[in-house]
Structure formats: structure tokens, C-alpha cells
Amino acid sequence: MGWETVMKQQKLVEKMTIEEKAAILSGKTVWQTREIDRLSIPSIFLSDGPHGIRKQAGAGDHLGLNASLNATCFPTAATIANSWNQDLGEEIGQALGEEAASMDVNILLGPGLNIKRSPLCGRNFEYFSEDPYLSGKMAASYIRGIQSKGVYACPKHLAVNSQELRRMAMDAVVDERTLREIYLTGFEIAVKEGHAKAIMSSYNQINGIYANEDKHLLTDILRKEWGFDGIVVTDWGGSNDHVKGVAAGSNLEMPSCGYDSAREVIAAVQNGKLKEADLDERVGELVDAVMELTSGKKLSDKNFDRNAHHQLARKAAAESMILLKNEKQILPLDTKKSIAVIGDFAFSPRYQGAGSSMVNPTKVEDMSSILQQYDLNILGMTRGYQRNGDVDENDRKFALNLAMNADIVIFCFGLDEISESEGLDRTHMRIPQNQIDLLQDISKVNENIIGILSAGSAIEMPWHTCCKAILHGYLNGQAGASATLDILTGKVNPSGRLAETYPISYEQTPAFRYYPSNEKTSEYRESVYVGYRYYDTSKVRVQFPFGFGLSYTEFTYSDLIIEEDGIKVSVTNTGYRDGAEVVQMYVGLPNAIVFRPEKELKGFAKVYLKAGESRQLRIPFDDKTFRYWNIKTGQWEIETGTYQIMVGASVADIRLTGTTERTGNSKGYPYNPAKMPYYYTGIVQKISDEEFRELFGHEIPNGRWSGKLGINDAICQMYYAKSRLARLIYRCLTKMKKKSEAQGKPDLNILFIYNMPFRGIAKMTGGAVSMEMVYGIVDAVNGHFMLGVKKIIGGYFRNRRNNKKYEKILKGAGGKCR
């Protein structure tokens, strides 16, 4: 934005009344900002869309309960991360931007790049990786693509938002080094390299401060350190104290909560709790964004090339699928052999997750409908098992008979819809048992089983010996079926590599004893040892390591050259098929003074090679290659030493190793190894209070609920309420929640309410409920029924009257706002 434009926006802000300034910082509807007609400041439209646009045609709601317009459903972020292809990410971003523009969407709420701290997070399908470097690079590519079409990307959720349980009322207790190195680095890359113009703050607290009110996070780090010059948007209903948010650097509270927050802002300016300069700065940043997104904007093409985007979704899915196993080269399929296709997922594919990201696709392929397009000898097809876990004995017998008479069985299975959803964490890593029972029975009558997996996060795989081949599609979008068959038939050579580790069991995971949380807090005792950083350092054997994936060809590595600013390495396709390899560069410092993982991903490159072709690749070092966060000095530093540079096909398959000397700039090391023995070994599953306190640098907050409930306590905490009515409501909500789970489809509305704090009632009702009324509700819950009812009734009429007054003020009718 040029200087003249900036000055013009400043003049606009100067012309605004305080009522207009306060009002514009909260939404007008579920998805729209507030316009100021008097000054020709228009409204803009925000929409979900990490992997497809979810613009609702009618009344808007946060969780997608009302139908949305048709849009391309691309593979989810967890899937695309397995491609390790930034060019592909940018291409998908461009398509998302085109579709958003065609629907007059100004800000696309994505991508999501929270770290996969635990496989149990119900929203892992929306996130890229357990590794911040890979997450950041892939997010930056999406952002560049989206914003090239005149639409803002809004990466989310800043920060440390790694669980769904009580996500709006949870305090993440995490040390500053872990925060910086693991949970903020991906966002740093997204801002610096993707040049994101919007950021969504997370629901949770970070060390006792709500992310949206954390000035250290939103101003000191985001704006000053990273150079962010866009707007910060709350997650929907995620504003706790709007005044504190504005002071900290947050620009837009969503969705609409009427004028309650605006009145709070005005009162805060009048009583000196909020500087008017801070208010003007937030308004100026928001107005800059609004005018940039709307000024001189051409009428967008209401149509996008649906077929081209479908083919892009197919290409993306094919490049992101991982071949985990291929014994005796059973794949690609021999077209002469008879094939039985078994599994409900072949008829009703699971191609996306549940929640606010759910897309209404332009079309959806399923394997059963498109098999005839391929030259395959299909003996027959059947579901074999019931999606909801029930057993149909006739269908099961038919499946076994079909398998017995076929040369090869394609078995389609995975996690069902209730297993992964926004608002709901998983309780285990297992695939539904009825699917595994059938798989094991089939393996007794046919040893040639090809397993086709659908799941948005890591799963336990004790049954893997039943399959000769396993192709993992993750949640591969609307064109996933054709992408799967392209790989099975050899039309496409698989090149996906895991962006997360697959442990043998959940009990192996580093946060096993700490996840998801205590009642009020979630303690990040595992520190920097997340994912492969833990397994690799503590020598824990896993099922499939980070970065792993097979191909129909073979690659060799040679001629590693380590230079001052990067490495060069030659890669050769030694097989008989064209294919792609993901070359991964890891860095470690043996015998480091400051504890650290044995190796960390610091660079990667995907290269396409014809059979017999060789190519030299260059992977540069950057400002993140050797750094660590020194909590003692509060800055990034480099430790002096001989660093190992390890190049390979996965974290466990290092082909070439070299060293480089680095002179550090440490001004004093932060830790006493004698007080932190387990952090220095990486064995972090049983960290004591004393050792975590040493890492954290403060007393550990009490994570238990106690005393009466407050506005920031979750509604599910009404289990402890003094009011019988409140406890009855809790039991009803719990019963409804369990009923939806038993039916195999999560009730997103119930899940959202269940984990929502009481203040969310005011933030999510469009101005119908004020904070005064919420305090009345809490009084009633705590047993003060009459006092609560009095506040609710009085608050209702005062809120209604004050909202009408505010409307008149904005329309220029005069009067004062209370």
C-alpha cells in the first residue's frame, strides 16, 4: 500500500466518531464486518476454507449447519503436507483464491498450521505436520497462492491450539523456548515468507493470558519481530475481554455480538483503560485492509473452471498419498488378475473432516462408480462391514466368499466420521474394530490384500501384517477415488512422504501422560520433543517414521557438498520408472551444551526424475538452520560447535552425512543439566514437577477446578454447579453428545456448546445476550437463582435499549451511548 493511500486511510480514521471506531472492530453478522456508510467504508466477507470455500448461501453459522455454496473440496492440509511440494501448495492456494473471489469472499480463514502435538487432536486433519518447518513452508505456499488472487489468507490459530477439549477455556502451560521453536516457528515462516495479511488468534490462554489479549504475542512478536502488517481476527466467539484484545493488537472480533463490545471499548477510552491512540491504530489497520480488499476491485468472475479445479484436486491427492508397504511388488496391479473390492469406504468415501472446514463439493468420486474407467478385472464389490460398527453377517459372509475367489483384494477402510472432528478429540488411535475383524478374516482366505486407508491423523496399525500393500490416502478430497486408482494401476508413481510419525501405540507418544489436559491447564512437559524429535532422540521404535514413503522406483544419493550457505547433493533414479523423491536435510549438534533433539528438519526439496536420470540439488541454509531460543537472554542464538548435516529419504533413512563448523553467539547458556537430566536425554514421558518447574521458569499453575464457576469456565463444568437445574442441563447436553457419538456423526452444535465458556453465550448470539446477562446466568448456575434471574431480565431490557441507541448514533440521529 502506497504512502498516499496510507495517508488517505488515516484521514478516514480521523473523520470517524468514537462510536464508529468502536463498532467497526466487531463483526456485523456471522461472516461480515461492519460498514460505515457515512464514510464509504464498505463491509468485507470472511469465510472458512482451509481446503475449500464454505460460503453459506442463507443464514450464516460458525459450524456449517446451514448449506454452503458448491466449491472444490481439495485434500486437507494433513494430506497435502505429505506431498512436500510447495509449488503444489501455491497452485492449490491460487485455485482457492479464485473460488473465493468468485463468491465475493475477501478473507479466507486458513490455512491451519497448528502443530500436531498428539495424534489424538480431533482437528489434526486440518493441520500440516508435527514439524514447524514443514508446516510453515507449506502454509506460506498456500498463502502466496490465495493472496495472488486479491483475497487475504488468514492462517490460524495463533497459537498453541493443539486440542479440541475445552479449547475455549484451556490454559496452555508452555516454556518460552518450546513456544518459540515448536509452536510459533510455522507462523513466523507463514508471515515472513507467505506475507500473510491476516492472522487468526486462538481460543486458548497461553501461560494465563488469552492469545487474543497477549501483547507480547500479537505486538512484540507478530508485528515488531516478524514485520506483520495485516489484521488480527479472533476465532469465532474467541474474544474474552475485547478491550484487552484491542490494546494487545487484535483488530476484529468475530462474529457479531451486537454493540456490547463497542460500548465496552468506549467506556474504556473514557475511563483511561484503553488509549485512544491504540484504538485508532487498530481501526487504521482494519480500515487499511478493508479498503485494499475493496477499492478499485473489478467485478469478479462468478464462475470458476470446475473441471480444471477437480483435476487439480486429483493431481494433489495423487501426489500426497503415501505407499507405506508393497511386498513382492504387488503394486502396480496386474490387470490380468481378478480383484475383489471390499469396504464401505469404496462406496462412501471419507474425503474430508467434520466441522467449520466442511465443504459442499462440486462433485464427489467414489471407487465403486469409476472402476469401469480402468483396465481392471473386477470380480465383484461389497461393503463387507457397517460404517457405524454394526455387523451384517450376510454381508460379511459374502465379502469372505468374494475374497476367497479373487486373486487380489482391495480393502478400503479407515477412521469414520465420529473419530475426527472439530470440537472432539479422539480417545484412542485405533480403527473401528469391526473393520479390523473383517480384514483379519479376509487375510485367512486371501493373502494378497491391498489396504486403502482413509484417516486424517496417525493410527495404530497392529494389523499391518494382514496386508501385502498399504496405500494411505489420508482425507484426499473430492477426486480422491481416481487419484487412488491412478496409483494402484501405475498411472501415477506414488511420491507422498509422511509429514507425521506413526508410532506403534499411543502409549509411545511423548505427551501420552500430559494430553489433552488437566481441568484448567494443559502442561507441555515434553518441551521441544514433539513427534520425531522425541522418537528419534529417545530411540523409540515406531511403525513408520517421519518423512517415510515408498515409490515404484529407487533413488540413490551421492556427492554431498557442504558449503557455508547450504548443501549440494546428487540424486539418481536407479529404477525403471519415472518418479519423484523428497530429499530431506536434517541438522544436529552432538554433545550440545543446550539440550536439543538429535536431529531436526531444516530443509527439503522434491525432485522429479526420469528413469536413469541424475540431478544435483541445492538446499540452502537460512536463519533457522542452527538457531535455538535462549530463555536467559530472550533471543535467538547459535551454539558454537561441529554440526552434523544429514541428508536422507526420512528421519530414519539417512543416506549421507557431513559436518560444518559454526561459531556461535551465545551470551550465557540457559540450563543446568544436573537439574534437568531427562530433558538432556529426550526421555520426557515422566517429567517431574521439579524438572518441569526448572524448564518453565515459574511455579506450575494449579490446573484443577475449584470454587464457584465463572464466565470463563466451560459449560461442561456445570457438572460441579450448585444449581440442580444447571446440573440437569449438563446431564441433558452430555446425553445428547453421547447419542450423536453412538450414531457415528458428531453433533457439532452440541460439541461447541459443551466446551464453550459461559462468556461465549454473549459472543455467539449476535447481540441478543449481553455480558451482564451472562453474569446473571453464572449467578444462577452457582445457586443464586433469583439474583441471576434479576440480572438476566434487567440485562435483557438494558441491552435491547442500548443497542437501539447505538444504531441511532451510527445513523447520525445523535444521542449518547451508554
Where are these regions (language model features)?
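Charged, amphipathic alpha-helical linkers/stalks
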Residues: 652, 658-728
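Terminal connector regions
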Residues: 623-670
